């Protein structure tokens, strides 16, 4: 009988290298928020991938960056604390970009950790095959990686091979989660993240990190219909106007797009009601951050 393997894998890397795209690809559902704006992942969203011979729990950590406020400080602590809890580390980089100071900072941190580290070069669909080996060699000068695997999370290139590589390093272990469970976050948290993703896609650079979403109510009204009421928080009146849009058009489009993803997640029809409120400087208010679901890790 084939042994069953299981383990926890941390995905770490600079903002926007494709960590959330990878999690969503291997889980097969949209769990982690995706956006072209930096610092969009605010929590350790666990994606659970269950196969017949293995269960892999992915921790999609916030991108490494220099904190500018209490929320940013929290995001950094989540990223670094995660490294002590896991069986292996995926260090993901954008193969289409030069090695930056952020990458160097992460590699210096990883050198001090005994956990296996896989270098995952993402976005190989954007570079010519001849350019791949020289870029890999540059990373090998910084540290010894357990494995080096090029992939495209967006296109799915080489992802199945990488999953097999991960499984070869996992210990024998049980299923930690039921077969049909894909995340350890409450559905309300994931719903709020889906709403926030649509706002990030539809608003300008000024808005992204000032946005928080709280799901106030989520009620199953009948067998195939769920009612969701959520509040979108911004820090300034001008941002409120941007999110709502002229004649409420922007907010209506946010609701329409979010509803489609939420219906796919829940497998039910969704009635979604959204409000926009100003909560000045909320990212520096610890209690408010906790209320939004970005809880402090406890020992």
Curated annotation (Swiss-Prot):
Major site of localization recorded for this protein: cytoplasm
Chain intervals for the UniProt region annotation (G4): 122-125
G5: annotated segments: 151-153
Stored InterPro entries: G_ERA_dom, GTP-bd, GTPase_Era-like, KH_dom-like_a/b, KH_dom_type_2, KH_sf_prok-type, P-loop_NTPase, Small_GTP-bd
Gene3D superfamilies associated with the record: 3.30.300.20, P-loop containing nucleotide triphosphate hydrolases
PROSITE patterns xrefs: G_ERA, KH_TYPE_2
Region called G2, residue ranges: 39-43
Era-type G domain sequence ranges: 5-172
Keywords: Cell membrane, Cytoplasm, GTP-binding, Membrane, Nucleotide-binding, Ribosome biogenesis, RNA-binding, rRNA-binding
Described purpose of this protein according to its UniProt entry: An essential GTPase that binds both GDP and GTP, with rapid nucleotide exchange. Plays a role in 16S rRNA processing and 30S ribosomal subunit biogenesis and possibly also in cell cycle regulation and energy metabolism.
Assembly: Monomer.
Protein name: GTPase Era
Taxonomic lineage from the root: Bacteria, Bacillati, Bacillota, Bacilli, Bacillales
